[in-house]
């Protein structure tokens, strides 16, 4: 399902296996638990890198599980359950006292892309993988915190339109040009992870206060943090 490995200052969160890494409630609970574990073990210089195995980073919520509820009402209730249980995952990433990097090994769609965008940096492969917000194609409305995250993280209305209102599957080079990801210069799953580790080690060497880092991060996204119920606290740990 997913694992957390500590390599010195780096925490590596991996969605394991060769499937689509759909977010079933059990998967969501496990991810949240691992983020809480990383937070509890964090020190100055800690970094989180999130990646996955196989063709997909994540293809979003487990819609097949929702549809097995046996009725439209049951399916809607299960979808609502996943939307609400995923909200604390986004909040946990914004509140995490360390820099965060998403290393996209493959396709990131819907809630899978939201997971990626919840990180400070997003790296993508150039040879494989698309970004895709499928809601307009499959007839689902956008949760408020999804929309707020996209507004917070993607700077131009043109880029947001391409991502949310066109149903377009965006490849790496275009995603960089639109300002959705930071880099897409890697030819393999290993390559994108290595690049993320390299950045992580560079950031870890700064030995920043994680609490200050998280406070500054949250101050950048007041609307999103308000929706997520996050408060920004002021920390004073100056290096004199």
UniProtKB/Swiss-Prot annotation:
It catalyses: a (3Z)-enoyl-CoA = a 4-saturated (2E)-enoyl-CoA; a (3E)-enoyl-CoA = a 4-saturated (2E)-enoyl-CoA. It is found in: Peroxisome. It is an enzyme of class 5 (isomerase). One of its GO terms (cellular component) is peroxisome. Disruption phenotype: Defective in root hair expansion. Mutant plants are resistant to the inhibitory effect of intermediate levels of indole-3-butyric acid (IBA) and 2,4-DB on root elongation. Its EC number is 5.3.3.8. Pathway: Lipid metabolism; fatty acid beta-oxidation. Coiled coil: none annotated. Keywords: Fatty acid metabolism, Isomerase, Lipid metabolism, Peroxisome. The record marks 135 as: Important for catalytic activity. A motif (Microbody targeting signal) lies at residues 238-240. Able to isomerize both 3-cis and 3-trans double bonds into the 2-trans form in a range of enoyl-CoA species. Essential for the beta oxidation of unsaturated fatty acids. Involved with IBR1 and IBR3 in the peroxisomal beta-oxidation of indole-3-butyric acid (IBA) to form indole-3-acetic acid (IAA), a biologically active auxin. This is Enoyl-CoA delta isomerase 2, peroxisomal. The lineage of its organism: Eukaryota, Viridiplantae, Streptophyta, Embryophyta, Tracheophyta.
């Amino acid at each position: 399902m997913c694992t957390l490995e500590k390599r010195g200052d780096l925490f590596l969160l991996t969605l394991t296996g060769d499937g689509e890494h759909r977010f079933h409630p059990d998967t969501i609970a496990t991810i949240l638990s691992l983020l809480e574990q990383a937070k509890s073990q964090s020190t100055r210089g800690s970094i989180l890198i999130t990646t996955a195995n196989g063709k997909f980073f994540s293809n979003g919520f487990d819609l097949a599980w929702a549809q097995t509820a046996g009725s439209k009402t049951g399916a809607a209730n299960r979808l609502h359950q996943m939307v609400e249980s995923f909200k604390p995952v986004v909040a946990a990433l914004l509140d995490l006292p360390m820099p965060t990097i998403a290393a996209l090994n493959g396709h990131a769609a819907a809630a899978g892309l939201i997971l990626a965008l919840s990180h400070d940096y997003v790296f993508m492969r150039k040879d494989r993988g698309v970004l895709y917000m499928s809601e307009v194609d499959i007839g689902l409305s956008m949760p408020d915190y999804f929309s707020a995250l996209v507004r917070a993280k993607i700077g131009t209305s043109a880029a947001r339109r391409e991502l949310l209102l066109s149903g377009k599957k965006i490849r790496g080079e275009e995603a960089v040009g639109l300002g959705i990801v930071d880099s897409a210069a890697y030819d393999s799953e290993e390559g994108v992870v290595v690049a993320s580790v390299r950045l992580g080690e560079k950031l870890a060497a700064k030995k920043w206060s994680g609490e200050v880092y998280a406070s500054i991060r949250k101050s950048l996204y007041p609307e999103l943090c308000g929706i997520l119920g996050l408060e920004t606290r002021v920390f004073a740990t100056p290096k004199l």
